[in-house]
Amino acid sequence: MSEETNIGVKERFYEELTEGQRALFMFHVYYNHINKSLIEFYWWSAYFMAQSKKWAALKACFKYFNDESFLLLLENIEQELKQHNHPTTLENFTITRDELNQNKELHASFESLYAIFENIYPATIEKINIFIEKNLQDFIQIEK
């Protein structure tokens, strides 16, 4: 399967989800990549930001779940990455995980951002759980 075909399949899958399922999917994908370490938090954030559709969907996810803290974190991540001239498209994306350790200012900023992430993600997960419990019909279809 070609890269273009693979992207098309992914986009069709995503489009078939409900708004709630999309929000949960985006959270799951992002969280599972960034929660492993500071370096993964940095690299995956840069990679997502370089894909405008994914970055916008990620922001929409936290708006959907009314999670202002995580939305603010994303805005701060974006600001920091742009300040350090990180690409906003995959066309120019050559970012490596090593770059974080090579730039002391960037490293210090992302250490602070990662500390915020570690502090807020338990509340984010709890908020999402409560939201799903109260709006189950937006996430699953129960056959009678």
Question: Positions of the model-derived regions?
Answer:
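Extended, alpha-helix-rich binding/interface surfaces that flank or overlap catalytic cores
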Residues: M1-W55, C61-K144
